[in-house]
């Protein structure tokens, strides 16, 4: 998922946080950032 400011900067469906410098790209969680998708996300 891409990050969505309408859900407090989290990625839709998975609760990861947006990287501030790339609010429409990277998603972050405790494992770090990846491009477009959050680690462990299978369906989004």
UniProtKB/Swiss-Prot annotation:
Its main location: secreted. It is found in: Secreted. It comes from the Eukaryota. Keywords: Bromination, Disulfide bond, Hydroxylation, Ion channel impairing toxin, Neurotoxin, Secreted, Toxin. Transmembrane segments: none annotated. Expressed by the venom duct. GO terms for cellular component: extracellular region. The modification 4-hydroxyproline is found at residues 23, 39. The modification 6'-bromotryptophan is found at residues 36-37, 43. GO terms for molecular function: ion channel regulator activity; toxin activity. Disulfide bonds join 3-16, 11-28, 18-33, 27-38. The cysteine framework is XII (C-C-C-C-CC-C-C). Mu-conotoxins block voltage-gated sodium channels. This toxin reversibly blocks voltage-gated sodium channel in cephalopods, with no alteration in the voltage dependence of sodium conductance or on the kinetics of inactivation. This is Mu-conotoxin-like Cal 12.1.3b.
